[in-house]
């Protein structure tokens, strides 16, 4: 019996260790899930992986807050039980922040009649049921727009509809039953516009499995150019809503506003009487927004939005709503001047830098940062530089390009110093950009240079201008 206490101690130690090990495994699993979720849907760069395990790390807390806010959760910045539960839910595979492909500008079809083709079928549903649900899903969008659709049975359609499993040729493999249900691509040639459905799911016509009509209507919204909505009642909300049966597949006002901002309302029926009415006065900024001669003082991104500055105002544009808001600069940042010269965002620092004359300011969200304004010469400019015409931050290289008349400088954001060997001639390294610049910014890997009422889309890898557009083309004018 002398060994009994030892055996009891061993038993206590083993029994006590088990729940601790299990808890540690659960936490590791949640951390892996968080990293995967943020990388897939919230544009978490691979260089940020090292911070994921440090849950109190500033950048990771901000990403968790961003996710919680987007999905309508309580914003805590912590990996709480509600957040973990949501990350386990079935959803669309299209990112909530960031995008599958690099495409410039605002994605929309340039025509109103589109073709679609059902390339193959799931074994879960009869073929005529799939045909009927795809037709119904397109009809939902057709009823509120000028768009019409016709089916083709061979060749390349605008929208190719496919069932697939795991790796299926687009570098975004499915993950088996649950989690990612489907994904779709924005309007454009090739694979763009196509919708892919995970055939490992159990597709149904009712709510007993994954309702195909509900998911198809959502994915085809992406095929028409819509992004995810933060409105939990919207069809374009990213999470699969198990409470919505086939009878409840309908558009919210948020969905209607989004799609009509791209294509407008449906044409009036010739048989419908039109009641005379007094014309409504235009909203502030509307006429100026679509003025063909419109130019901008400065442009910058801000947490996924784009800010277009003009005089003492700015337009605030998001990729989810596509309808720009119009505000006085002072309503968000009272100390900022009007008539801004240049602006750019350093995403890794969550800061936007605003330039006017020989001074610059820093803002974070709607907060102005202490210690500003500072002189532009603290960045390393020579005394001869009196003002900045435009600036672009290259996220991939972590460099900022400053454009002054016909020259440019490059600033290393990591080292916080101007690089040697500058200035250089703009025309030499940016062929085709030979006008004096008013504004510039980066979007989806392209640089956009603005001069007067024109903008030049520039591919920095190919070093060439790819499109010349009106400056206000971002406003869907």
From Swiss-Prot:
Glycosylation sites: 120
Encoding gene per record: MMP3
Residues annotated for Ca(2+) 4 binding in this entry: 297, 389, 438
Positions bound to Ca(2+) 3: 175-176, 178, 180, 198, 201
Binding, Ca(2+) 1: 124, 199, 201
Disordered: region residues: 260-285
Family stated for the protein in its record: Belongs to the peptidase M10A family.
First-level EC class: hydrolase
Binding residues annotated for Zn(2+) 2, in chain numbering: 92, 218, 222, 228
Name of the protein described by the UniProt record: Stromelysin-1
Hemopexin repeats: 287-336, 337-383, 385-433, 434-477
């Amino acid at each position: 019996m002398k060994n009994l206490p030892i055996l009891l101690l061993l038993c206590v130690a083993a029994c006590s260790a088990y729940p601790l090990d299990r808890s540690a495994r659960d936490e590791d699993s949640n951390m892996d899930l968080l990293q995967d979720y943020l990388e897939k849907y919230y544009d978490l760069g691979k260089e940020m992986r090292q911070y994921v395990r440090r849950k109190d790390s500033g950048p990771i807390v901000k990403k968790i807050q961003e996710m919680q806010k987007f999905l309508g959760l309580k914003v805590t910045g912590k990996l709480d039980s509600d957040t973990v539960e949501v990350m386990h839910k079935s959803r669309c595979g299209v990112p909530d922040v960031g995008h599958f492909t690099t495409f410039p500008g605002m994605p929309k079809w340039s025509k109103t009649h589109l073709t679609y083709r059902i390339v193959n079928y799931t074994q879960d549903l009869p073929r005529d049921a799939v045909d009927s649900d795809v037709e119904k899903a397109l009809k939902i969008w057709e009823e509120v727009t000028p768009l019409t659709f016709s089916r083709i049975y061979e060749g390349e359609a605008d929208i190719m509809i496919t069932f697939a499993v795991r790796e299926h040729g687009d570098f975004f493999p499915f993950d088996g039953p649950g989690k990612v249900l489907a994904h779709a691509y924005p309007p454009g040639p090739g694979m763009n516009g196509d919708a892919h459905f995970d055939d490992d799911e159990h597709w149904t016509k009712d709510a007993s499995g994954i309702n195909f009509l509900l998911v198809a209507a959502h994915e085809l919204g992406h095929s028409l150019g819509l992004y995810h909505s933060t409105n939990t009642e919207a069809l374009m909300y990213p999470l699969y809503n198990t409470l919505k049966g086939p009878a409840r597949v309908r558009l919210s006002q948020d969905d209607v506003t989004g799609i009509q901002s791209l294509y407008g309302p449906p044409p009036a029926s010739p048989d419908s009487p039109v009641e005379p009415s007094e014309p409504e006065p235009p909203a502030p900024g509307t006429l100026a927004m679509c003025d063909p001669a419109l130019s901008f003082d400065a442009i910058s991104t801000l947490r996924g939005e784009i800010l277009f500055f003009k005089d003492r105002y700015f337009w605030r544009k998001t990729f989810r709503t596509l309808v720009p808001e119009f505000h006085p600069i002072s309503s968000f940042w009272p100390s900022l001047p009007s008539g801004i010269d240049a602006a750019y965002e350093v995403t890794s620092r969550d800061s936007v830098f605003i330039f006017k004359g020989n001074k610059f300011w820093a803002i974070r969200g709607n907060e102005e940062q202490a210690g500003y304004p500072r002189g532009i010469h603290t960045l390393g400019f020579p005394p001869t530089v009196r003002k900045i015409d435009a600036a672009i931050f290259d996220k991939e290289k972590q460099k900022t390009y400053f454009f002054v008349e016909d020259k440019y400088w490059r600033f290393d954001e990591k080292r916080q110093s101007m690089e040697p060997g500058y200035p250089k001639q703009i025309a030499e390294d940016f062929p085709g950009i030979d006008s004096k610049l008013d504004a510039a910014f980066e979007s989806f890997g392209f640089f956009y240079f603005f001069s007067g009422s024109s903008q030049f889309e520039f591919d920095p890898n190919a070093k060439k201008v790819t499109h010349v557009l009106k400056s206000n083309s971002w406003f869907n004018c």
